[in-house]
Amino acid sequence: MQPVSIIATELNEIGDIARVVNSLLSQVPPPAEIVIVDGGSTDGTWEWLSEAASREPRLIAIRDETCSLKHSRGPVSRGRNVAITAAKSPIIACADAGCTYAPDWLRNLTARIVAGNAEYALGGTCLDPTGYTVWDVASAPFFSVKLSATEPTKSCTARSMAFTKDLWQRIGGFPEQVLVGEDTLFDFEARRHTHPDFVSNAKALYRPLNTFRTAARQMKRYAISDGQAGVRWSRLFRNSARCLLQLTALIAVPWTRLPLLFVFLLETWYAFHRDFHYLHRFGFKAVLARFAFSVVVPWLVAVNQIRGRFSAKPLTNWQNQGQGTGR
């Protein structure tokens, strides 16, 4: 059986690092190694990680301060590339410092790669049932996060992704020119070389603990990054059209309310068509929050993707001010 290395990056994740490391060490069968790159933490994360590595030979801790915005436009990508370069196994599984993982996650995610039947696998993400906010539930589908571990997914996220080291080398690694959305760009390139294996039972358990403000800020940052990278034009056009329809309906209210009714029905479909079967279990407050967030999304995407396209200024990362983001 081919060995597998798990890699992750972190910066100022003292509140989460123990949970993620313990869940990765509990994988059955165990990984050959777990390589974690610290980008220069100042909150005690590095001290915890290095002490844990001194007790656990499978845990490889690397401190590389070039994997931060002080030195790199894309610190998360750089951290992953550093970790993968250091990893000794021919198969790489990506994990995330803001997630935890079931004991069979690694086995399920890499099964077809280990068997030689795939080069690239995607497991997806679902909300951690042990801790979430109403805005986590409301914003989930807009960040490719599922509400249930049994919900099918075909989304790409480096929270649960595996590939051969050879594929990573052919692609040229994770793109270091963007702060966020780097896994999407990696996925675009990977699909030029191979077809992904979608694994339904290998989801990362994610606990973002969002407020409306933090969820909106994250959506804004992803849109700016898409604009800077020049990707997802169809999403920009779709969301711009929704903005135009909303404005037209409001302007027409003094004469007729039919356009407003049409927009209401359209936005209801956008808000709930993906996962209402799971969403309604979270209660009426979550349903209302989902509708509210969905109405705001086209404005966040359209305005900020255009802004990103015409801005050369790199995004800022609040990890550099001492707050973790689970990335």
Feature names for model-found ranges:
Residues 100, 104-134, 207:
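Conserved donor NDP-sugar-binding/catalytic core segment of glycosyltransferases
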Residues 128, 145-166, 179, 204, ...:
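A recurrent flexible, glycine/aromatic-enriched loop bordering the glycosyltransferase active site
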Residues 22-31:
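Short, acidic, metal-binding catalytic loop of nucleotide-sugar glycosyltransferases
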Residues 66-87:
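Glycine-rich, basic loop-to-helix element that forms the pyrophosphate-binding segment
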Residues 38-47, 66, 99:
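A conserved acidic beta->alpha catalytic loop
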Residues 175-234:
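Catalytic donor/gating beta->alpha subdomain of glycosyltransferases that bind UDP-sugars
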Residues 92:
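Short aromatic/hydrophobic "clamp" motif used to bind/position activated sugar donors
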Residues 1-23:
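N-proximal low-complexity "stem/linker" segments adjacent to membrane-targeting elements
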